[in-house]
């Protein structure tokens, strides 16, 4: 369940940004989870709901998770495309089998909404 360590790191990163900007709290965290990242979005959500309670800055934080679809790249012609079958894909442009996953393996912090009181 590496999702727990991912969420712990995510909360630490968010707290660091919040403190850097003198935020009173973190209103919203938005992340993107790639379809082939190996991360279970439901477990991330569950872990976040638990761990946020231990953070004074995240007590009422909303977590928004966006799914990032897989995009493949042909290493022969450079064409980017989405495929139905990710275990075996052929470039629709040049019919090459020399393709790699270009997007969809990552987990990104997209945005933070901070409550800043002056």
From Swiss-Prot:
Ni(2+) binds at residue 2. GO terms for molecular function: nickel cation binding; zinc ion binding. Keywords: Metal-binding, Nickel, Virulence, Zinc. The keyword Zinc applies. GO terms for biological process: protein maturation; protein modification process. Zn(2+) binds at residues 74, 77, 91, 94. InterPro entries: HypA/HybF. Pfam families: HypA. Involved in the maturation of [NiFe] hydrogenases. Required for nickel insertion into the metal center of the hydrogenase. This is Hydrogenase maturation factor HypA. The lineage of its organism: Bacteria, Pseudomonadati, Campylobacterota, Epsilonproteobacteria, Campylobacterales.
